[in-house]
Amino acid sequence: PSTGMPTKSEQTDLLQALYGRNGESPMPVIAATSPTNCFDAAYMAAKIALEHMTPVVLLTDAFIANGSAAWKLPNLDEYPAINPPYVTPEMEGTWTPFQRNEKTGSRYWAVPGTEGFMHRIGGLEKSNETGVISTEPENHQKMTLLRQAKVDKIADCIPELEVQGDADAELLVVGWGGTYGHLYSAVEHMRKNGQKVALAHFQYINPLPKNTADVLKKYKKIIVAEQNLGQFAGYLRMKVPGLNINQFNQVKGQ
């Protein structure tokens, strides 16, 4: 983000990534955790974008950008396939521009120029199914809910939240994005000194992993450490009410 201190690192644009659009416009948000994780994060962002027909925000930070690590070129055959919801010839004559896939809630992709699938696109609100411009109140309400549901369903396609550290810990350290290396080192240092502590680091921000609430509610105390004034902590409080969340916030550009 723009820190006012060029080349310095912060995590101060999380809420902008989540909500910085006109109206209720939910969008998936992913945060890379390290230089070596950037490729995997970008691949998954592309997979989500193409399979669910949605823009995706992929967050990095200056610390990741200026960092380096050994990275072995991956075998792409080991990555999950990307399967966009293309229209099929059998759909010609019955397809409508806003017809949705029942599993994902996404529209089918009629690539421009595909014979028999001509349609209009644009930034104005559309009527469900037909894609015709509409300002009807009930339709706008329905379309807003459909867009939110589409993003929510992405939780079915992302990995569950993993916890590292002591299985019997009462304290959970929570982070997201490029602070992973520092938080992991801090947690390991505490464990070597005899403290029972665990780490949960988030890469998928919106939607959150499906098991997020189950994981967080196991711990008596949670410390959310981030380079802002508590944006992710507030987001977690909203998504999982009732947690004992404590904040550790620094905005020092490092």
Language-model features: locations:
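Active-site/ligand-binding-proximal alpha/beta "capping" segment
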Residues: S25-A49
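Residue-level detector of functional hotspots within protein domains
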Residues: T3, L15, E24, A42-M44, ...
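Conserved structured core elements
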Residues: K8-Q11, A32-F39, Q141, G177, ...
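Short beta-alpha connecting loops at secondary-structure transitions
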Residues: P1-M5, E24-A31, N244-K252
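Short, contiguous clusters of charged residues that form electrostatic/catalytic patches at enzyme active sites
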Residues: T12-L15, D40-Y43, G181, K210
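Flexible glycine/proline-rich, aromatic-decorated loop/lid segments
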Residues: P1-E24, M238
